[in-house]
Design a protein with these regions (language model features):
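Short helix-capping/linker turns of helical repeat alpha-solenoids
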Residues: 7-14, 21, 51-70, 86-110, ...
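Short coil/linker segments at helix-helix boundaries
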Residues: 1-45, 68-85, 110-123, 145
Length: 201
């Protein structure tokens, strides 16, 4: 009996020790999983601050909206307001990166926050495609033309296609005639560089 009792005590101690180890490891894993979320939130906040201060690269990253975080409805409304403002500023400074973000087919390519402010209309995508085409050359120009043909077929309305071309011509002459020639798709957000610049913000 005493032997059995001793074995029971040993067993209970082992079980308790195992439970404590499980709890400890669970806590460590929980803390580890929280670290990326904290860093991502800090990145979101720092990019937003830099964008509001006029950093063009930060504005592109902010508009692109590839943030793996959950935010409140109020924060999302603020993102939308800021992103629309940064889009307008990007167009006014002739920033091809902003145009390229808006030229993506939102049903296929856009994820993250950008889908909340980017139009899902083929006519708007075509406008941005045609604007890019004014600055494009070589294989990239051919790529844009192919996409434009597909968009025109989806629209099925020559008047809308003509309107998109006219808008793109006017916008190019107004803001983009001095922008660099495009031999390939413009780079969007240089996320790695921004991460390096804002680790402690």
């Amino acid at each position: 009996d005493s032997l059995g009792s001793a074995m029971d005590d040993t067993c209970r101690r082992n079980i308790k020790r195992a439970e404590e180890q499980i709890q400890s490891q669970t806590a460590r894993l929980t803390n580890c999983s929280a670290v990326p979320a904290v860093l991502e939130k800090a990145y979101f906040d720092s990019v937003g601050r830099a964008a509001e201060l006029g950093n063009a690269d930060a504005q592109v990253c902010y508009v692109q909206g590839n943030f793996s975080i959950e935010i409140s409805d109020q924060q999302m409304e603020r993102y939308k307001d800021n992103a629309r403002n940064f889009i307008q500023l990007g167009l006014e400074r002739g920033d091809w990166r902003i145009v390229n973000l808006l030229a993506q087919d939102t049903n296929v390519h856009i994820s993250g926050f950008l889908g909340s402010v980017s139009s899902r209309s083929p006519i708007d995508i075509l406008r941005m495609n045609r604007l890019l085409r004014h600055g494009a050359t070589g294989g990239y120009a051919q790529f844009l033309d192919t996409n434009a043909k597909d968009l025109a077929i989806r629209l099925g309305n020559k008047a809308q296609v003509d309107s998109a071309n006219s808008w793109a011509q006017e916008e190019y002459e107004r803001h983009f005639h001095n922008s660099p020639i495009l031999n390939s798709e413009p780079e969007d957000c240089k996320e790695a560089e921004l991460h390096e610049e804002t680790p402690g913000q």
